[in-house]
Amino acid sequence: MALVKLKPTSAGRRAMVKVVNADLYKGRPHAALVEKQSKNAGRNNSGRITVRHQGGGHKQHYRLVDFRRNKDGIAARVERVEYDPNRSANIALICYADGERAYIIAPKGLEVGQTVLSGPEAPIKAGNVLPIRNIPVGSTIHCVELMPGKGAQIARAAGTSVQLLAREGAYAQLRLRSGEVRRVHVECRAAIGVVGNEEHGLRKIGKAGANRWRGIRPTVRGVAMNPVDHPHGGGEGRTGEGGVARSPWGQPAKGYRTRSNKRTDTMIVQRRHKR
């Protein structure tokens, strides 16, 4: 895996930096683990925009990734590592000893031909999945469950990981990449290691069209709109925000906390914001 800065043969390629991985599989995905997905361009069932800046983009098939990893005691061989257009991380196609195949999130260092294992007796090796009660304190883990059996929800993006800080009774403490310290049940499962493709965040798209390929539409500034469309809109000539910066719906846009309280707030030991 390497970062490649392209030659400035055009304005769009002048600042472009790509992540090139020659080891990725170049064929089609495993047909049995692929589903069609339709685009809705950010509209709901009545045709109104509910999510801005979405629309267009290249057609994609959804890869069915196994986030539960609950086939305990059955070794699986890594057949290939593939690109997945639906996420920043790469995925690995594994084949269990009984012939079943599945996609998993590819951790850093996972290579074709290696064996991965799930279950309480699995060795502490990158790609293996164990209950948190069987993982040594201080280990770096990814694809962590929030509820036992629900499937991985934390640390699934490229280059992300979680550190296991402590175990106290039925709960363990994890430090997330954001700085938040959170409790999860020790029966929740996690994979050993760091998610691969860690250079994903260093790429530069180079041109606006690359975002359009991804289905991301332009973001218009509020000060360029009319007053009916945005709190910053209107005025003669170029004007500023005219006060506190606000969202299109009137909420303060900078520093205002919008997170609602939840029942699971009791599981947060330390917030990511330093108070």
Swiss-Prot record:
SMART domains: Ribosomal_L2, Ribosomal_L2_C. It comes from Aromatoleum aromaticum (strain DSM 19018 / LMG 30748 / EbN1) (Azoarcus sp. (strain EbN1)). Pfam families: Ribosomal_L2, Ribosomal_L2_C. Part of the 50S ribosomal subunit. Forms a bridge to the 30S subunit in the 70S ribosome. Residues 39-48 have a biased composition (Polar residues). One of the primary rRNA binding proteins. Required for association of the 30S and 50S subunits to form the 70S ribosome, for tRNA binding and peptide bond formation. It has been suggested to have peptidyltransferase activity; this is somewhat controversial. Makes several contacts with the 16S rRNA in the 70S ribosome. This is Large ribosomal subunit protein uL2. One of its GO terms (molecular function) is rRNA binding. Residues 36-55, 223-275 are annotated as: Disordered.
